[in-house]
Amino acid sequence: MFKRLSLYTLLLCLVPFFVWGFTYHWHGNNQLMEWDYWLYLLTETGSVPYALITCAIFALLFRFLFENRKQWIMGVIVMGLSVLSTQVIKTGLKTVFAEPRPFTVYLAEKTESTTDAFYHQDRSERAKLVDKFYSTQADTPAWLKAHYEDETGYSFPSGHSIFAATWLMLAVGFSQLLGNRSFKAELLIGAMTIWGVLMLISRVRLGMHYPIDLLIAIISAWAVHVIIFSFLQRKNIFSTNKEVDN
């Protein structure tokens, strides 16, 4: 269990490591390409309210991992607690560290203001400042400007990244806990990995986060799920004859 969760955590961590390795820094949208719109659509699967739909779809996709409906319902409860706990951790860390997002830093630089002044405003005023500034930026499309207006909170850590990492950890954790090594289970984990990696890339590419925001989000999700699945395994809550432990 621990090894498998750690392996997929490491795979996600490759994204911020590669960003650092290639010294990529977001500084405006002058390098934005057409395919970035597809990254935006993907990143929206982790945005409120669409994230709720994503959760419902994923919970249904996980159904085949469980032996019966009762076991699946218990699993859905664990999924809900997992998503809720990681989002609470994310919110707490954002409040404590209060780090500005890349696109707000860029706004402050170009308007000769400060991020402190920006975040001193309430969210509605921040959205107006974002709209006013990015409306003058020809390289920022309307869909991205609207996304910025909706995401004027703090940067560290990434909520979308912890959301994506959480669902990957759930897929890996439940497949291990229930001993489901079927092709469908491996396909689910593979799809969740690709979705998660693209989610992480989108957050940096669209000017929403720094690599450290992604890294801490991933590690936080890993730590939470090591605790969750260790507890479930120890208490034998999901009893099954196919359980594996590695």
Positions of predicted regions on the chain:
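Alpha-helical transmembrane segments in multi-pass membrane proteins
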Residues: I77-T86, K90, A217, A221, ...
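Aromatic-anchored segments of alpha-helical transmembrane domains
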Residues: C13-G21, V83-V88, I194-V204
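Helix-boundary and loop/linker segments of multi-pass membrane transporters
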Residues: W26-M33, E67-R69, P141-A142, R181-S182
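N-terminal transmembrane-helix/juxtamembrane module of multi-pass inner/ER membrane proteins
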Residues: M1-L65, M74, K90-E112
